[in-house]
Amino acid sequence: MGRKKSCHVHNAPSDDDIMFSQDHKPKRIYQLWPGNNRFYCGGRLVFGPDASSLLLTTAMIGGPALTFCIRMVFLIGKRYPLFHSLILLGALLLTVLDFTFLFLTSSRDPGIIPRNKEAPEAEGLDMITQSSEWVNNKLGNTKIPRTKDILVNGYTVKVKFCDTCLLYRPPRASHCSICNNCVQRFDHHCPWVGQCIALRNYPYFICFISTSTLLCLYVFVFSWVSMLEVHGKMLLMVITNDLVFVVLILYCFVVVWFVGGLTVFHLYLICTNQTTYENFRYRYDKKENPYGKGLFKNLYELFFARIPPPMINFRDWAPEEPDEEVGSIASELDRTFGPRGDKYDMEMEIGGCKNSKVGLQLHTLEYDNNNSSEETVKKKGVSEETAAFYIPGIQEPANITRNSSIDVRSR
């Protein structure tokens, strides 16, 4: 007897299937992050939205430093080669350090706080005193207090609710309107580095502005020394014969007042354990500072304490978002059949109610194109009240209000 040959027909994927698979490729968190940050090297480098300002900062530092180094190279061949070689080496070292601290400040996660998808419920909040000012969350179903009071080192500190990130900001945290993130121990957003200055990059920022001040003073002093050494001590002859050193001296004299003043101001903030935001807003120099620990402990906390790891790993794979229809059905079932706090995930089959009849019924329910919705219900043994949430044609149960958020569509 001849054997029948079984032939399998393999259909080539259509363009719609290809586009669907491309759209549903897994993505990393940095690719879906709702903030305004710029990510490079696969999410390893986190810049602010105004990172282009780094070009101006680099030019303002590198231009004078490079000019000074080139001038020193010409002086090495004329007289005192060892002396000018040491000056050149010191200038190169300070310039490299300055750019290193600039890069570490601008490309580092400053301490971004993860966002919530839903606002906390007002009745579940543990607070000392409740604010009289209330705010609607994004769902518009409940109201929560805009502020709450917590204890920090024996002091009562008021923390605010962030309408964008849907969370109560931790103490000393604030929402940066430029980066659109809540940031830990927020100091300020620096336009010169194009990044928020906060918990995880503040030590590098201090090193950056301190090194910039030292570089300005270094170029200023040794430009004078080299100029007087080469051209003598007559000021008029010096100015007319070496305009390069004159321009460097004037430039560094102007810049050092700004960057040097900024360095002194932040050294004061470090000694008193304040941030720029707190200094301008709360004026802790005129009242008790709940974060002050004394001079030496404040210095130790900044320069020697371990920098905490980031709260978000932007290179992690982003969790797949459930379908909106499935999510609305699950939430409605949870509110109707399950006790408060019990949750069931229809896709992952996990939750606090693993043996729930609703979960088992949803798991075993299948749609049959050849049978009607009523036949499917009878076949699978699903009650009409349960089936009304996800099967068209079944009458809506009486205990569900008409303004339900469920969106049931015909399959």
From Swiss-Prot:
EC number: 2.3.1.225
Tagged with keyword Manganese: no
Tissue spec. comment: Expressed in flowers and pollen.
UniProt-annotated location(s): Cytoplasmic vesicle membrane
Domain spans labelled DHHC: 160-210
GO terms, molecular function: protein-cysteine S-palmitoyltransferase activity
Membrane topology summary: Multi-pass membrane protein
Reaction(s) catalysed (UniProt annotation): L-cysteinyl-[protein] + hexadecanoyl-CoA = S-hexadecanoyl-L-cysteinyl-[protein] + CoA
Signal peptide range in chain numbering: none
Keywords: Acyltransferase, Cytoplasmic vesicle, Lipoprotein, Membrane, Palmitate, Phosphoprotein, Transferase, Transmembrane, Transmembrane helix
Top-level enzyme category: transferase
PANTHER family registered for this protein in UniProt: PROTEIN S-ACYLTRANSFERASE 2-RELATED (PTHR22883:SF484), ZINC FINGER DHHC DOMAIN CONTAINING PROTEIN (PTHR22883)
Domain remarks: The DHHC domain is required for palmitoyltransferase activity.
Known function: Palmitoyl acyltransferase.
Protein name, entry field: Probable protein S-acyltransferase 2
Record organism: Arabidopsis thaliana
Lineage summary: Eukaryota, Viridiplantae, Streptophyta, Embryophyta, Tracheophyta
Chain's gene name: PAT02
